[in-house]
UniProtKB/Swiss-Prot annotation:
One of its GO terms (biological process) is hydrogen sulfide biosynthetic process. Residues 94-98 are annotated as: G2. It catalyses: sulfate + ATP + H(+) = adenosine 5'-phosphosulfate + diphosphate. Pathway: Sulfur metabolism; hydrogen sulfide biosynthesis; sulfite from sulfate: step 1/3. The keyword GTP-binding applies. This is Sulfate adenylyltransferase subunit 1. Residues 28-242 form the tr-type G domain. PROSITE patterns: G_TR_1, G_TR_2. Heterodimer composed of CysD, the smaller subunit, and CysN. Residues 115-118 are annotated as: G3.
Length: 494
C-alpha cells in the first residue's frame, strides 16, 4: 500500500478492494481479531466503541457505563474503555493488563476480539491473544506516530502467523484531522511491515471516542479519506482455513462402552475425513481404514476441522490418548528434535538445557530446551543467545525429545504446530511456542546413508504396520508416488 495514495479506494483497503464491497464473495465465518499497540493509544476505547455502535452492550452495562464515565471522562462522551477494563487494577490505573475477549456482530458477520495490554511488561499477554487471531488491528496515536511498542506488537503478531493488518491511526481529531500526518504514519509503517513479510495492510484514520470511521463514516470530518471504515474492512477479511491440509485427529480418549465398540475421540485439528479413507496412527505407524464417524447422537458421512467426533476403524490397532490419527497421503512431521520459537511467560524465564513437560494438543511428553537466539524487538533482529530466556523474551530454541514427537509447522496448522512448556517443579506454564521445522539428528541421515525402497502401497502399509518398522517409524521417510515416477527414480540411481 502506498501511503501517499491512502486517499484512494483501491489503496486504502488492500485486504480486498473496497470499491467492490457489495460484490465480493464474502467469508462469513466468525473472524478472530486482536487489538494491539502502545499504551494509551486507545485500544480499549476502540473496542468499547465497536460494542456500543454494533448494539452489543446490554442495558445494565450501558447504565453502569454512563454512571462511571463521569468519574474519568470530561469530554461529554461515555468512557467506552470501561466496557473492557474488568480488573480493579485496570480501572485504577486506566490501563489494560489481562487479555479481554468480547463478541459482537453485524448483519454480515460475527467477530471475536481480544483487547491486549500495551505495556512492555505484559508482552506475554499480548502474544497469547495473537496466537488465535486472523487479523490484527494495530493502533497508533496520530500525535505520536509509530513507537517501539508498536513495532514490538507488530513483530509478535507477524511471528504468530497473522498476515492481515489494520493500521488504525487513532485520535486523528486531536491533530485537526491532519491528512499529511496520517499519510506519513501509514508510509512509515508500510516500510517497517515489509521487513516482516506483511503485505495486507489497511490504514484508516479514526477517532475511536467520537466513533469516526469505526462503524460509521467519518467523511464529514475527513472528506479527503475515501476508504472503508474499520467494520467494513473487518467484514471483508479472510479466516485461515484448517480444512485444506491433511487430516489430523489428536486422540483425547479411547471409548469402550462395550466389547463390540471401540472408538477414538477428539476434535479434528485439520483437514477432513470420511468412511473408507486410509489413515495412519502416529507415532506407531499402524495403518487402518475409517469404518465409521460417530457423534453423540448420529452417524456422519464426513468430519472436518473443528468437529468433535468418535472415529471407528476397520481393524484393531493400538491407540491411546496422545496419539494422532492422520491421513496417509499428507502426514505431519515426526522425530526427536525440532526447531521452534517460544515466548517466555513466567518471571523465571526459560533455563537452558532444563527438561520441561511439553503439551501439544492431547500429547504430553518430556523435552529438553536449548535457546539459540533471542529477538531484539528494538532493532527487529535475531541475536545469538544460548543462555536462559527472561520473561517476555521471544527466542528461537531447539527441542530434544526422549520419545517421538508429532507436529506440523505452525505456518501450516496452528493446532498441531503449537505447544506450551510446563515447569515440572511448579506445574506453571512457562512458555508458549510454535514449531518451525524438524531438525536432523541422525549421523546416517546427514551422510546420506539411506536406502530407497519402491513398494506397492498395499505392501508398504503392511510393512509399516509390523512391529519392527513401527518401532522405527520416526526414522522412515514415506513418499507416495505413481509407478512411472518410481521407475524413473530407481533408474536415476543406476
Amino acid at each position: 500500500m502506498s501511503a501517499a495514495a491512502a486517499n484512494t479506494p483501491s489503496s486504502s483497503a488492500t485486504i480486498l478492494p473496497f470499491a467492490e464491497h457489495s460484490k465480493v464473495a464474502r467469508d462469513t465465518r466468525p473472524l478472530r481479531l486482536i487489538t494491539c499497540g502502545s499504551v494509551d493509544d486507545g485500544k480499549s476505547t476502540l473496542i468499547g466503541r465497536l460494542l456500543w455502535d454494533t448494539k452489543a452492550v446490554k442495558e445494565d452495562q450501558a447504565a453502569t457505563l454512563h454512571r462511571d464515565s463521569g468519574k474519568q471522562n470530561d469530554l461529554g462522551l461515555p468512557d467506552f474503555a470501561l466496557l473492557l477494563d474488568g480488573l480493579q487494577a485496570e480501572r485504577e490505573q486506566g490501563i489494560t493488563i489481562d487479555v479481554a475477549y468480547r463478541y459482537f456482530a453485524t448483519d454480515r458477520r460475527a467477530f471475536i476480539v481480544a483487547d491486549t495490554p500495551g505495556h512492555e511488561q505484559y508482552t506475554r499477554n499480548m502474544a497469547t491473544g495473537a496466537s488465535t487471531a486472523d487479523l490484527a488491528v494495530l493502533l497508533v496515536d496520530a500525535r505520536t506516530g509509530i513507537l517501539e511498542q508498536t513495532r514490538r506488537h507488530a513483530t509478535i503478531a507477524a511471528l504468530m502467523g497473522i498476515r492481515q493488518f489494520v493500521l488504525a491511526v487513532n485520535k486523528i481529531d486531536l491533530t485537526n484531522y491532519d491528512k499529511a500526518g496520517f499519510e506519513l504514519i501509514a508510509h512509515e509503517f508500510r516500510d517497517f511491515a515489509s521487513d516482516l513479510g506483511i503485505k495486507q495492510i489497511t490504514a484508516i484514520p479514526m477517532s475511536a471516542l467520537k466513533g469516526e470511521n469505526v462503524v460509521l463514516s467519518g467523511k464529514a470530518s475527513m472528506p479527503w479519506y475515501e476508504g472503508p471504515t474499520l467494520v467494513e474492512t473487518l467484514e471483508l477479511a479472510t479466516v485461515r482455513s484448517t480444512q485444506s491440509g491433511g487430516f489430523r485427529l489428536p486422540v483425547q480418549r479411547v471409548s469402550r462402552p462395550g466389547e463390540s465398540f471401540r472408538g477414538y475421540q477428539g476434535t479434528v485439528a485439520g483437514g477432513s475425513v470420511k468412511p473408507g479413507d486410509s489413515v495412519v496412527v502416529l507415532p506407531s505407524g499402524m495403518v487402518a481404514n475409517v469404518k465409521q464417524i460417530v457423534t453423540f447422537d448420529l452417524v456422519r458421512n464426513a468430519a472436518v476441522a473443528g468437529d468433535a467426533v468418535t472415529l471407528v476403524l476397520d481393524r484393531q490397532v493400538d491407540v491411546s490418548r496422545g496419539d494422532m490419527i492422520v491421513s496417509i497421503e499428507a502426514q505431519p512431521l515426526t522425530g526427536l528434535a525440532f526447531d521452534a520459537q517460544i515466548v517466555a511467560l513466567q518471571p523465571g524465564g526459560i533455563e537452558a538445557g532444563k527438561r520441561y513437560w511439553l503439551k501439544s494438543a492431547s500429547r504430553r511428553q518430556r523435552v529438553s530446551v536449548q535457546p539459540v537466539s533471542q529477538l531484539n524487538l528494538r532493532e527487529g533482529e535475531w541475536q545469538a543467545h544460548e543462555t536462559s530466556l527472561p520473561m517476555n523474551a521471544i527466542g528461537k530454541v531447539r527441542l530434544s525429545f526422549d520419545e517421538t514427537a508429532i507436529f506440523d509447522p505452525y505456518e501450516q496448522n496452528r493446532a498441531t504446530g503449537s505447544f506450551i512448556l510446563i515447569d515440572p517443579d511448579t506445574n506453571n506454564t512457562v512458555a508458549g511456542g510454535m514449531i518451525s521445522a524438524k531438525r536432523s539428528t541422525g549421523a546416517t541421515e546427514e551422510q546420506g546413508d539411506r536406502v530407497i525402497l519402491s513398494l506397492p502401497a498395499g505392501l508398504a502399509e503392511k510393512l509399516l504396520a509390523g512391529e519392527l518398522l513401527a518401532k522405527h517409524r520416526d526414522e522412515i521417510d514415506i513418499r507416495r508416488t505413481d509407478a512411472a515416477t518410481a521407475s524413473r527414480l530407481i533408474g536415476d540411481l543406476d
